[in-house]
Amino acid sequence: ADLRVLSDNSDSTTRSAGGRGFDRNLGGHAFISSINVNFANVGSMEENTTYARYVGMDAIASLNEYDMLNSDKACELRGVNQQIMAAYSNGVTPVMGTGTPVTEDADFSIKPMCCLNKMSAGVNGLSMARTGNITLAIVLADNLDALFGQVVDVNSGYELRNLRVDFKSVPDSKTPESVTMGVVNDFKSNLLSGEATISTNVAALAESVAMNFIQNQHESVPVYNSYKMENIQGLQEVQYLFNSQSNSLVSFPIRDRTEMLERFIASMQDTSHNQVSIDKYRSNAGWALGLNFDEAIDLSNNTFTVQLATTVNQNYPVNVFMYFFSRRTI
C-alpha cells in the first residue's frame, strides 16, 4: 500500500510536514486494528481485535534496532528510530539537480502476523479442499491509534492507497495433508485498583499467555503512542491461576521482576516467535508479562485468572491486553 499522513484528515493534499509518525516497531502494521481469518468449511479460524499491540509486543521481544535494517523489516516501514518514522510520514522527496522534486507517498509491504502465515513447516500449502473459500478481513486503525507525535491532534489522519493482497499458491494436492497453524486469541480488560483480578475463558487449547499494558489516559488520544508497552505503576506481584489437564489447580505467584520478564520471554518462544530473547527485550523500551503453561490447557471450560498487586487506582486506570497462543489443525 501507499501511505499518506495528513495534517488535515478532510483534505488529501495536506501532507504531514513533521511532528507526526507511527511506531517504529510496527511500521505498516500500525495501521491495522484487527484481523479476522475465516474458512468457509470450518468457520472463524482467528480473530485478533487488538492486532497492532500484538505485533508491537512481539517486536520488543524479538527485534532490536539493527533488525529493522533487514529487508523483510525495512519493506514494512519499520525503523531504527522515531526520526525515521517521521520522515516516512512526510513522504519521499527525491534529490534533484534541476527541476522541481515531487513528493511521493511512502509505500510498504507487510506480512500479516496471522494464522495464514504461521503454518507447520514441510507442508505443501493449505488445501482449498479442506478450507473452502478463505476470507481475510482487516479493519484499519483509528487515526489517533495509528499516529502519534508532538503535533498530532484530532484533525490528523492517514490514507492508504493502492492496497493489494498477494498470496502464493501451488497446484492443489489430491491427497491434502493436515496443516497445523498458530492462532492468537486476544482479550482486553483493565486495572482499576491496586489489588486486581482478571478472569477469562478462551475457546482454545492454549499453550501460553502474554499481556501488555497502557494507561487508559494514553490510549487513542493526541500526542501519545497508543501502542506503547507501558510499565505498571508500583507492580509488586503477579499470580497466574488455572487448572491443568489433570484438573489440579496450578498457581504461579511471582514477585521478582526479572523472573516476570523471563516468564514473558518463555511465553513467546514456542509460538512461531523463534527470535525472542531477554537481551533483545532489554534493548527495547517496553514492558510485558506472560506465562508458558508447559502443556496445552483447554480454557473453554477452564477459567484462566491473573491477579496483580500494584499501586494503580481508579483515577489512573490501566488497560490490559491479553494474548493466548494456541494451535489448530485443519
Describe the residue ranges of each PLM region.
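Short, low-complexity Pro/Thr/Gly
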Residues: A1-I330
